[in-house]
Amino acid sequence: MPWVPREHSHDDVQLQEFSRNFPVGRFPYECLEADIMAKIGLEELNGLEMEVMRRQMQMTSGRLHILEDQDATWCHKEAALFTLLVSVCIANLWLWVHW
C-alpha cells in the first residue's frame, strides 16, 4: 500500500511544539516536575505549599491503599470462582462418564 500523507491537525502542531521543547525520546511529563522543582528550589517552598503537597500525597496514598485492598479482594473472589468452575466441570464430567 503506498504511503499517503495525511492532513495536519491541531494535535500535530502541539506535538511539533513539544518535540522542539524537549529532548528526543523524552516526553513532557517525564521531566516537567523535575524542571519545576529545579526552578523553584526546595528552600523557596513556604509552609503552605508544603502542607498542600503533604495533603495531596496523603490523598494519593489513601487512594492507592484502597485500590490495593480492592485488588486483593478481587484476587480472592477470582480464585474462589475458578475453583467452583473447575469443581462443576469435574462433577459434570464424572456424571457424563457414569451415565
Swiss-Prot record:
GO biological process: apoptotic process; regulation of apoptotic process
Compartment(s): Mitochondrion; Mitochondrion outer membrane; Endoplasmic reticulum membrane
CC terms in the record's Gene Ontology section: endoplasmic reticulum membrane; mitochondrial outer membrane
Superkingdom of source: Eukaryota
Transmembrane domains' residue ranges: 79-98
Membrane topology recorded in Swiss-Prot or TrEMBL: Single-pass membrane protein
Keywords, sorted A to Z: Apoptosis, Endoplasmic reticulum, Membrane, Mitochondrion, Mitochondrion outer membrane, Transmembrane, Transmembrane helix
Assembly behavior: Interacts with BIK and RNF183. Interacts with IMMT/MIC60and EMD.
PANTHER family in UniProt: FETAL AND ADULT TESTIS-EXPRESSED TRANSCRIPT PROTEIN
Function: Involved in the regulation of endoplasmic reticulum (ER)-mitochondria coupling. Negatively regulates the ER-mitochondria distance and Ca(2+) transfer from ER to mitochondria possibly implicating it in the regulation of apoptosis. May collaborate with RNF183 to restrain BIK protein levels thus regulating apoptotic signaling.
Protein name (record): Fetal and adult testis-expressed transcript protein homolog
Species of provenance: Mus musculus (Mouse)
Taxonomic placement: Eukaryota, Metazoa, Chordata, Craniata, Vertebrata
